[in-house]
Amino acid sequence: LGECDVALAGGVSESIRAYGIFAGFKSQGALAAHEDPTQASRPFDRGRNGIVVSEGGCIYVLERLNDALARDAHIVAEVLGYRINSDGTDYVLPNPERQEECIRQAIENAGLSPSMIDLVSSHATSTPQGDEQECKALRNVFGDSTETLINNTKSFIGHSMGAAGAIELAGNLPSFADGYAHATINLDDLDPSCALSGLVENEAKKKAGGIETILNNSFGMLGIN
């Protein structure tokens, strides 16, 4: 845009010592409980019952492609497009129609079509209603395509709040090099309402032809997509 040469973008969250976060999710019935903590975060599974709060951080350096090439930078990805919108309906419950709109507009902004998306990094937080609503949006955009793979990083690391989007994208960037979409783990009993044709269940999957495009979903409270 001609306003800056380099920008830092990402997120950092120190959440696990913040009592209010746990109390808030608990009061909403959205905090996960499981006898085995390693299996508590289980997006799309029938037994999912809430968020596993985690923390971490990830920061990206953003610059013009020509500038990065000129300094011989190690380029991990190119930002093709983005979109942000608001559900405008409920403090907690998502609106799949607005999520779908956000996804479609992001793809359009990138100059692509849904069939050109190789991998979707889903936002699903392991909550009963949130996961189902996102799946409705994804199903409306990608239909029954098996060519667009869909996975979830929170199944491994939980929900790192404001850092989640940046961290989950980082978890999928290696796909550009090796062509593998990492799995969505802890999927022992897939909820039919969350069934997606391209869902990568429990084991990583290599995509024929490689992975060249990633759509990274981040849908926050207050309906901010």
Which stretches of residues belong to each language-model region?
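A glycine- and small-aliphatic-rich helix-loop capping segment at beta-alpha/alpha-beta transitions
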Residues: 21-35, 97-99, 133-145
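Beta-strand segments within the central parallel beta-sheet cores of soluble alpha/beta enzyme folds
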Residues: 4-13, 74-82, 115-122, 148-155, ...
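Condensing-enzyme catalytic core mediating Claisen C-C bond formation in acyl metabolism
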Residues: 36-110, 118-119
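Conserved beta-strand-centric core segments of catalytic alpha/beta enzyme folds
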Residues: 1-67, 164-225
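Short glycine/threonine-rich loop-to-helix capping motif typified by GTGT followed
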Residues: 88-99, 125-142, 160-168, 201
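Short beta-alpha connecting loops at secondary-structure transitions
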Residues: 46, 87, 152-158
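Glycine-rich phosphate/pyrophosphate-binding beta-alpha loops
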Residues: 125-127, 156-162, 218-224
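Stable alpha-helical structural segments in soluble proteins, enriched in small hydrophobic residues
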Residues: 102-110, 137, 141, 172, ...
